């Protein structure tokens, strides 16, 4: 098991796992961060107050907190009463990769992907980071016609192409 060494450089709660088997390590909004309203479509970089020494051969990958808006310590205040079981948070994490050779303070990139403003509050869980092994593969440029040695079942299909595979040979009226 690797150890992720960290240092606090601001007044912030130490990163922690929700449970012993949680993949993600929870990060908090620093206590000295001003309460901030984030408008729909806007983004924000929050200094985490944490520097990390990422072990050799690893990276940190940022991820959204699935329970952020449903927890009692909600990170966002939407001003709306949540529906039973609804996930209210429109906050997503951007700029997710932290390379092993980065030595500065981590910043958390928040994006309001919703259609209403949210309020970011100090002291609450905002994101999680996962320690992920990295394969530093070699890069080799080859001519496009030499790139693949066999044709796969998927081929050059794009996003969602496996869902429409059976529709390709149907007329439009047959698909409706």
Protein language model annotation of sequence segments:
Residues 1-176:
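DUTPase catalytic domain/fold
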């Amino acid at each position: 098991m690797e150890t992720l060494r960290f240092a606090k450089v601001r007044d912030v709660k130490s990163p922690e796992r929700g449970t012993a088997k949680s993949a993600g390590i929870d990060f908090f909004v620093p206590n000295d961060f001003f309460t901030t309203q984030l408008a729909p479509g806007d983004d924000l970089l929050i200094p985490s107050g944490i520097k990390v020494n990422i072990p050799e051969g690893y990276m940190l990958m940022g991820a959204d907190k699935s329970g952020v808006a449903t927890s009692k310590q909600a990170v966002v205040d939407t001003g709306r009463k949540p529906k039973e079981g609804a996930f209210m948070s429109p906050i997503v994490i951007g700029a997710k990769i932290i390379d092993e050779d980065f030595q500065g303070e981590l910043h958390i990139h928040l994006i309001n992907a919703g259609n209403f403003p949210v309020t970011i509050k100090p002291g609450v869980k905002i994101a999680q980071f996962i320690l992920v092994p990295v394969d530093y593969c070699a890069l080799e440029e080859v001519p496009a016609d030499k790139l693949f040695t066999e044709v796969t079942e998927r081929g050059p299909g794009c996003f969602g192409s496996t869902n429409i595979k059976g529709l390709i040979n149907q007329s439009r009226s047959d698909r409706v």
